[in-house]
Regions:
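Active-site phosphate-binding strand-loop segment of PLP-dependent enzymes
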Residues: 30-86
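Conserved PLP-anchoring active-site segment centered on the Schiff-base-forming lysine
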Residues: 1-16, 182
């Protein structure tokens, strides 16, 4: 998705999977101190000459459990015309009023360009994951993303289990509320 004409700006405490993805992409790589919006803004200013800029962050930082400042990140992305990629693997299913993750919690769902998550945590599948994005991004990934091209499809029972979990979450917030109370 990103080329050597682009830049990716990653939170320093992102999950290892994001860090490895950043290392593998051809874009110019930048890091900002965890949650430091002033440094993120500086990196956005420094990379204004790039074709595309993408801010990459976890939704929930797994080691400490605190949330990325998605409202502020999205404001900066709008101001500097950057894309926002959120890995919400540690939030899908229970963060946000209806469990739709950190973008829902911060009211910025429509401002997230690429959302990734797993089916192996709160969504109950045990393996697999997904990317949600605009159709043009999904189409590009289906054609160019080597991990997608050279992997197997998720097993139908896992999809069935995840579908059931999503039905349960849509029908009631009781499970999510219990997690948040604890």
């Amino acid at each position: 998705m990103l080329t050597d004409q682009d830049a990716i700006i990653s939170d320093a405490l992102n999950h290892a999977s994001i860090i490895d993805g950043v290392r593998l992409c051809k874009a110019e790589r930048h890091r900002y101190a965890n949650g430091d919006m002033a440094e993120l803004e500086q990196k956005l200013k420094e990379t204004q000459g790039k074709r595309l800029r993408m801010i990459a962050t976890d939704g929930v930082f797994s080691m400490d459990g605190y949330l990325a400042k998605l409202d502020q990140i999205c404001e900066l992305a709008e101001k500097y015309d950057a894309l926002v990629m959120v890995d919400d693997s540690h939030a899908s299913g229970f963060v946000g009023k209806t469990g739709r993750g950190t973008p829902e919690h911060f009211g910025v769902t429509a401002k997230i360009d690429v959302l990734t998550s797993t089916l192996g945590k709160a969504l109950g599948g045990g393996s697999g994951g997904f990317i949600a994005a605009r159709q043009e991004i999904v189409d590009l990934l289906r054609q160019k993303a080597r991990p997608y091209l050279f992997s197997n499809t998720v097993a139908p029972p896992i999809i069935g289990g995840t579908h059931r979990v999503l039905d349960l979450l849509a029908g009631s917030t009781a499970l999510r509320d219990a997690v948040m109370e604890n």
